[in-house]
């Protein structure tokens, strides 16, 4: 698969709550997720966080997907069942190495997510 297809499949797997399939698209060594208020260096930690968000996830809408070689950029709408927050727009940059995602950099309004989690963010360690 091309990098763009790998990322599209990853997003589809997260939306459908197929976390084992999504995790299989991530490298095991050298993985990194960086967001404005959290960081994961282990795919298991990212998947545990995603699993924890299932209760509020209404939909994950892929609005745009662009790629240049192994770099893939996605615009997503994270729709929630948590009415005080509503939807969160995300810009996500993926670096693909071979047939796996090596790095995920997410950009979004961190204050919204922090409020949604009641100020309890996962540890960055």
Language model regions located:
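C-terminal and inter-domain tail/linker signature
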Residues: 1-125
């Amino acid at each position: 698969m091309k990098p763009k297809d790998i990322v599209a499949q990853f997003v589809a797997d997260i939306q459908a709550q197929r976390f084992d399939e999504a995790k299989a698209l991530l490298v095991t060594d050298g993985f990194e997720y960086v967001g404005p208020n959290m960081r994961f260096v282990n795919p298991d930690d990212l998947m545990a966080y995603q699993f924890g968000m299932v209760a509020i996830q209404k939909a994950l809408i892929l609005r745009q997907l662009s790629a240049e070689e192994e770099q893939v950029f996605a615009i997503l709408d994270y729709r929630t069942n948590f009415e005080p927050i509503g939807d969160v727009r995300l810009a996500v940059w993926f670096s693909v190495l071979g047939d796996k995602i090596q790095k995920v950099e997410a950009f979004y309004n961190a204050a919204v997510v922090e409020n949604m989690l009641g100020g309890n963010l996962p540890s960055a360690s």
